[in-house]
């Protein structure tokens, strides 16, 4: 049963310690303590499994909270657990600036813990730097460099030693160009002398996701263009592209090596920067030079969209002939053009061809759903069902599949076919357990999962086991990540990850975990979520196997800022999982993100709304980019929208997005008591999708973290990754 219960909350902790004589050391537990992130241990025999461990179960605790238990484990006889405990104790002592004690704990640890030998040497050097003994500190850094010269950890020694001997910095850049310390060196050297194309290109290649890279690129292009070779221009172009500087990217792609992707992005960059005539010319060059490349099909579609109807139809016909993966989309576009030309019979023939020959395409699914909705609007529910039922059967991976299957059940209810409706809802829950419509189906089946009228009052129990194991990376990286030593794991991964343009499934999943560990949640969630888009058969099979694991889904639905969310959810009597679900949709847990409309932070609070709330609660100073302030103000407003609509969460969440006045207008306008029909009737496409996304997020947090609901869903679905019962309740 889902129950109301009270929580005991623990504030997160974040420490950043600067060691004397060495660069800033970010406490490795910072993100996982400050943000309350929990990436959980999956079940089943697969690459994500982590054996039970007393040490790993303590990773989520602060140094003071875990010290006693780690000491007890460290006193045991020689074992892996003992070595792990000693390593964490030493790391915690360094954070607490107790160098002498850390040195003692680290003594001879390499003998029992060889996979972290290089990092033990690093910890020893960091510990000595706290003692004030310059001679031994220097010796420790030299020892690290000599004994582990081929390890990426050597970059840390090269960074420190290079402060007095500049050749070490050049050695770091040469040996470990992608290591964070090498990038730090490049930035420092560019401050001294900005005109160094080699270093600017280094940052463009390995640090392009930082927004401050754009001025670096601008300087490089304006001052050193004559020195750049085509491959350099490709590096610059990609960095501009990733930062959405499409016009600048187009200029750079024009000078890059001629490949289908580069030429396509050249044309697309021109189009996005409103240079349509030039874009058309480049698209035509692409199609002529690479007639069978996938990008040529994309270019033909772009040309069709910006051309006059008859010319557009010729482009679409070429797509149908040469690019079967894009044929469905091309046929729909052609049919729409024929409709506009008043050639209704020809349009009908094209749509029939779509269904007959390309019935498994996304375009066919979307067309079927369009017709099904039209039939349902006329209350012809039998015809609507006939059109919709092919979608989950032939397009099971399409986003419309669970929606169509759900509405088949709703229409069956209207026809008085209650058994058929029950079968349809069970089908949705069985085949699409991750969908918003699975939650709605579970509700209509009478399962105890909450609904729009009760979800606010529920305080679900949820369980937070230990972190998942990365699929890719060295044994050292996996061990560091399990131990919560995030800064060291991330630095190591930045060197080991050599194929970011074409990563394997395992590499992309691991990269997503590292972004989550850095607190860059939008990128991390996106990397993990878009694994489902793989279409190469082998990679698709790898994703299907991964998606059966609980750890994959829990990484996709993480818990940043959990302590703050719990605190303010309790303050305003809100379901903490619903608050988390809303934040995931609003900001992907990015505290400084801003919308084009001006909304700010985790819960995307508008400045004017924030001022109104602050006056109501007598808060004189606040910062919407501060998670504490943003969640305090956002949950107040979430409470307000719930109170305005009598705790009916459907309307409260819709009004959070569209404003309560619009929701009140819709209530008067739409004559329905059916919540599902109301959602479908919302005239704002953004708000309609927003409602489904927020409650879909809520459902996923519930089914992935609540043991009771997880077991309930598992009774219906064999693709739902159920939880085991050996997890600790939050």
Question: Each PLM stretch: what is its role?
Answer:
Residues 2-101, 105-107, 111-112, 116-119, ...:
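Cell-wall glycan-active module
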Residues 621-629:
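A short, structured beta-strand-centered segment in the mid-to-C-terminal lobe
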């Amino acid at each position: 049963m889902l129950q109301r219960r009270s929580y005991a909350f623990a504030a997160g902790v974040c420490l950043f310690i600067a060691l004397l004589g060495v660069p800033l050391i970010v406490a490795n537990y910072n993100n996982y303590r400050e943000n309350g992130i929990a990436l959980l241990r999956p079940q089943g025999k697969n690459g994500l499994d982590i054996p039970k461990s007393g040490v790993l179960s303590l990773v989520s605790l602060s140094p003071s909270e875990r010290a006693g238990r780690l000491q007890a484990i460290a006193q045991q006889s020689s074992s892996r657990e003992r070595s792990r405990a000693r390593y964490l104790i030493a790391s915690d002592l360094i954070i607490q600036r107790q160098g002498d004690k850390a040195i003692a704990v680290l003594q001879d640890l390499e003998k029992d813990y060889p996979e972290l030998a290089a990092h033990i040497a690093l910890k020893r050097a960091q510990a000595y730097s706290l003692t004030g003994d310059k001679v031994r500190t220097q010796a420790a850094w030299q020892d690290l460099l000599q004994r582990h010269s081929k390890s990426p950890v050597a970059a840390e020694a090269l960074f420190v030693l290079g402060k007095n001997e500049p050749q070490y910095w050049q050695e770091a850049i040469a040996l470990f160009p992608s290591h964070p310390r090498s990038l730090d060196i490049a930035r420092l050297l560019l401050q001294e002398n900005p005109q160094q194309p080699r270093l600017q290109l280094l940052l463009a290649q390995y640090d392009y996701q930082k927004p401050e890279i754009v001025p670096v690129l601008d300087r490089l292009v304006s001052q050193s263009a004559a020195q750049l070779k085509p491959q350099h221009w490709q590096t610059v172009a990609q960095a501009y592209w990733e930062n959405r500087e499409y016009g600048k990217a187009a200029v750079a792609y024009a000078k890059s090596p001629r490949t289908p992707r580069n030429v396509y992005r050249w044309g697309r960059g021109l189009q996005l920067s409103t240079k349509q005539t030039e874009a058309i010319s480049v698209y035509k060059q692409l199609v002529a030079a690479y007639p069978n490349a996938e990008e040529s099909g994309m270019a033909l579609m772009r040309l069709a969209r910006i051309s006059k109807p008859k010319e557009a139809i010729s482009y679409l016909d070429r797509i149908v002939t040469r690019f079967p993966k894009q044929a469905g989309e091309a046929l729909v576009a052609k049919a729409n053009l024929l409709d506009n030309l008043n050639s209704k019979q020809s349009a009908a023939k094209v749509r029939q061809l779509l269904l007959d020959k390309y019935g498994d395409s996304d375009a066919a699914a979307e067309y079927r759903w369009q017709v099904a909705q039209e039939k349902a609007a006329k209350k012809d529910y039998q015809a609507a069902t006939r059109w919709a039922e092919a979608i989950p059967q032939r397009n099971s991976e399409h986003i419309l599949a669970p929606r169509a299957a759900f509405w088949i059940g709703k229409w069956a209810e209207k026809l008085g076919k209650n058994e058929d409706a029950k079968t349809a809802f069970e089908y949705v829950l069985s085949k699409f357990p991750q969908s918003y419509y699975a939650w709605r189906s579970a509700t209509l089946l009478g399962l105890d999962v909450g609904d729009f009228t009760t979800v606010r009052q529920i305080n679900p129990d949820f369980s937070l086991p230990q972190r998942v194991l990365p699929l890719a990376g060295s044994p050292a990286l996996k061990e560091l990540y399990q131990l919560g030593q995030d800064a060291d794991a991330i630095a190591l991964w930045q060197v080991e990850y050599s194929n970011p343009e074409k990563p394997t499934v395992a590499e992309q999943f691991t990269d997503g975990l590292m972004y989550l560990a850095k607190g860059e949640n939008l990128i991390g969630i996106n990397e993990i979520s878009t694994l489902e888009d793989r279409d190469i058969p082998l990679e698709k099979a790898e994703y299907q196997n991964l998606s059966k694991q609980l750890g994959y889904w829990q990484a996709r639905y993480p818990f940043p800022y959990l302590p703050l969310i719990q605190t303010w959810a309790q303050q305003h009597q809100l379901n903490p999982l619903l608050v988390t679900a809303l934040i995931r949709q609003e900001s992907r847990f990015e505290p400084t993100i801003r919308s084009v409309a001006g909304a700010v932070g985790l819960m995307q609070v508008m400045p004017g709304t924030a001022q109104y709330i602050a006056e109501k609660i007598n808060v004189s100073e606040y910062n919407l980019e501060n998670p504490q302030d943003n969640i305090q103000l956002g949950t107040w407003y979430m409470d307000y929208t719930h109170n305005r609509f009598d705790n009916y969460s459907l309307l409260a969440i819709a009004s959070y997005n569209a404003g309560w006045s619009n929701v009140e207008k819709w209530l008067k306008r739409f004559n329905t008591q059916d919540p599902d029909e109301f959602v479908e009737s919302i005239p704002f496409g953004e708000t309609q999708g927003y409602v489904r996304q927020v409650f879909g997020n809520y459902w996923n947090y519930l089914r992935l973290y609540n043991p009771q609901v997880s077991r309930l869903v598992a009774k219906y679905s064999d693709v739902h990754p159920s939880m085991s019962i050996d997890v600790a309740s939050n």
